[in-house]
Amino acid sequence: MMKKDSDSIFPNRRTLQERNQTRKRMVAHVLRAQFKKEFKTCRILVGNHFFTVDLMSNDDEIAAKIINPGITSHNKMSSGKFQQILSSIMILKSIDSKRKLLIFTNKKMYENFCASISSMPTPICDTVNGIEIAWIPLSDEFDNYEHSEPATDFRINQDIFGRARK
């Protein structure tokens, strides 16, 4: 009979999951302060598949997907991460919430995504129409293990596109 190891063969996986949960709590704190609503994680049915919405207001009017850091060693966003973000946008677009937020927790990721999406062909660039892209500055400090209090700054659609993407 085989015995399960008590130690994970992926020791960083648990740490990463814990860090992402901490980021989610911090973002929920900022959204609660910004919108005066409670937020929770929920699973929704889209077609015949269930998807996780990172944060949904209790009245279902605001849905948010959180984009955590994922920069390569060359300070670029990988194509896999870019595709993951596009997938998150498609899920947000399929939800009936009035406001749909794509929230970055790292300034470099936010800037890289905005620069990348604005330079894409129209079909890809237009995927962000109807989505509010925001940056909540916490991961720059948090990634260095120095963040202590939840950030309260919430920056939606800074003028990277030259026009608001709503």
Regions found by a protein language model. Name each.
Residues 47-48, 56-58, 94-97:
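Flexible, charged surface loops at secondary-structure boundaries
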Residues 43-44, 103-107, 136-140:
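Acidic carboxylate-rich catalytic motifs and surrounding loops in phosphoryl-/glycosyl-chemistry enzymes
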Residues 51-68:
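Active-site beta-strand-loop-beta-strand hairpin of nuclease catalytic cores
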Residues 2-46:
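Acidic-basic catalytic patches of nuclease active cores, encompassing PD-(D/E)XK
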Residues 40-44, 50-54, 76-77, 86-91:
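Short secondary-structure capping micro-motifs at structural edges
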Residues 2, 86, 90, 115-166:
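Non-catalytic C-terminal interaction segments of nucleic acid-processing enzymes
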Residues 66-121:
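Catalytic cores of nucleic-acid endonucleases
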Residues 33-34, 94-98, 127:
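Alpha-helix C-cap/termination motif
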